[in-house]
C-alpha cells in the first residue's frame, strides 16, 4: 500500500520514509468504491504503526459509465479499450475529454464520439492557431531570442493581453491548488 510498498519500506529506503520525504503523501486518488477499503486501511495502518495519517488529502474519482449511464463491463460488451482509444485518438484528446466533461469526483458518461469532437474542435483550433503563427513568424523572420520589451514600453494592447494572461494563470493555479481541475 502507498507509500510503504512503493519504496519497499521497511526493507529498503528507511531513511527516506523516516525523514518524512515521502510520508505522509500530499494526496491520493482512487475510485469512490475504495473509500471503506483502501482509504481506511492506509489510515488504520499509519495510525497503528506510526501514530500518523498516511495522506493529507484524498481525491475520490467517480465511475466511468458508458454513454447511456450504465456501468462499463466486459460482460455487457460496453467497455472501451483504453489502449486502442489512445492509439486512435491520442492521449491528449482523451485527457482533455475526461477532465472537461465532469469533475473528477463525479461519474462521467463516456462517449467515444466526444473524443473525436474534442480533437476536432479544441485541438484542431489549437493546431490551426499555431500554424497561423508559425507561417507568419517564419515569413517575418520572428526570433524569440530578441530581448524582452519592458512592460511600460509595450503598447496598451500588449499590456492588456499580458494582464489577462497573468489573471488566467492566477485563477488556474488557485483552482488546481484547491483540487478543482475542471474549473481550471
PLM-predicted stretches and their roles:
Residues 1-139, 144-147, 154, 158-184:
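Structured secondary-structure scaffolds
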Amino acid at each position: 500500500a502507498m507509500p510503504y510498498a512503493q519504496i519497499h519500506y521497511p526493507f529498503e529506503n528507511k531513511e527516506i520514509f523516516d525523514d518524512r520525504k515521502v510520508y505522509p503523501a500530499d494526496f491520493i486518488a482512487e475510485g469512490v468504491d475504495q473509500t471503506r477499503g483502501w482509504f481506511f486501511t492506509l489510515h488504520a495502518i499509519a495510525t497503528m504503526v506510526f501514530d500518523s495519517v498516511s495522506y493529507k488529502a484524498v481525491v475520490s474519482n467517480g465511475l466511468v459509465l458508458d454513454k447511456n449511464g450504465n456501468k462499463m463491463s466486459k460482460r455487457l460488451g460496453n467497455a472501451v479499450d483504453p489502449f486502442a482509444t489512445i492509439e486512435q485518438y491520442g492521449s491528449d484528446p482523451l485527457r482533455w475529454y475526461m477532465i472537461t466533461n465532469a469533475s473528477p469526483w463525479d461519474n462521467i458518461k463516456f462517449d467515444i464520439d466526444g473524443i473525436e469532437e474534442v480533437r476536432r474542435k479544441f485541438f484542431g483550433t489549437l493546431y490551426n492557431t499555431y500554424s497561423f503563427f508559425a507561417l507568419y513568424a517564419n515569413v517575418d523572420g520572428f526570433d524569440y531570442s530578441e530581448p524582452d520589451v519592458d512592460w511600460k514600453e509595450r503598447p496598451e494592447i500588449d499590456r492588456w493581453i499580458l494582464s489577462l494572461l497573468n489573471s488566467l494563470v492566477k485563477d488556474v493555479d488557485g483552482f488546481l491548488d484547491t483540487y478543482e481541475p475542471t474549473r481550471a
